[in-house]
């Protein structure tokens, strides 16, 4: 990421989504949120650090479990309001707090997706 890239933290009340992807497999592992402070800490440390919306504090993913997310590369989307971190997962590779590699483990059926679309229209 070039030094002149400015991340847009204004659209979501000071936060921007951070998508985490395994650099080797391409699998999407998780989504978290960053504020300017957590983004600066991420770039400085080389490990993904989020802003915990629940605890209202910085949260280096894997700091306790040992499954830290070491950054291989970082990029932004065309609007500069979403970040993509390609990472190497340290430790046993289980990123999700439920003990799975990815947080995205609950498939939706097409019928459920259609029902969800209908619910949002009403």
Regions found by a protein language model. Give the residues of each.
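C-terminal binding/interaction regions
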Residues: 2-15, 21-29, 34-122
């Amino acid at each position: 990421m070039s030094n002149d890239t400015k991340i847009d933290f204004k659209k979501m009340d000071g936060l921007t989504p951070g998508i985490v992807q395994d650099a080797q497999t391409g699998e999407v592992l998780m989504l978290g949120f960053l504020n300017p402070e957590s983004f600066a800490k991420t770039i400085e440390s080389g490990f993904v650090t989020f802003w915990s919306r629940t605890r209202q504090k910085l949260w280096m993913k894997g700091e306790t479990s040992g499954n830290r997310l070491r950054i291989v590369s970082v990029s932004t989307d065309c609007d500069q309001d979403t970040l993509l971190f390609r990472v190497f997962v340290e430790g046993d590779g289980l990123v999700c707090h439920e003990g799975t590699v990815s947080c995205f483990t609950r498939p939706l059926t097409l019928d459920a997706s259609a029902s969800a679309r209908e619910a949002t229209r009403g």
